């Protein structure tokens, strides 16, 4: 029984990859750099222009592409700065 329990714990750790979390920048436009820990394995940076000028949004994951918005997705820590 102990062997089965130990096996389940090891499989859970391997499947969940508990040893690594991604960090992405999440500041908006020209705000000071801020970092967040993400469950996703990628970061994004969206850039677009509106009546306020050039806008930048950063965060975790990789959202769907939209017209007139430049989107960069990347897969290393803080790669979206």
From Swiss-Prot:
Tissue specificity comment: Expressed by the venom gland.
Record's subcellular location: Secreted
Xref: InterPro entries: Snake_3FTx, Snake_toxin-like_sf, Snake_toxin_con_site, Toxin_cobra-type
Keyword Nucleotidyltransferase attached: no
Taxonomy, superkingdom: Eukaryota
Keywords: Acetylcholine receptor inhibiting toxin, Disulfide bond, Ion channel impairing toxin, Neurotoxin, Postsynaptic neurotoxin, Secreted, Signal, Toxin
SS bond list: 24-43, 38-60, 62-73, 74-79
Single Gene Ontology MF annotation: ion channel regulator activity
Chief subcellular location: secreted
Secreted found in the keyword field: yes
GO-annotated cellular components: extracellular region
Segment forming the signal sequence: 1-21
Pfam family, one: Toxin_cobra-type
Family: Belongs to the three-finger toxin family. Short-chain subfamily. Type I alpha-neurotoxin sub-subfamily.
Biological role stated in the UniProt entry: Binds to muscle nicotinic acetylcholine receptor (nAChR) and inhibit acetylcholine from binding to the receptor, thereby impairing neuromuscular transmission.
Entry protein name: Short neurotoxin 1
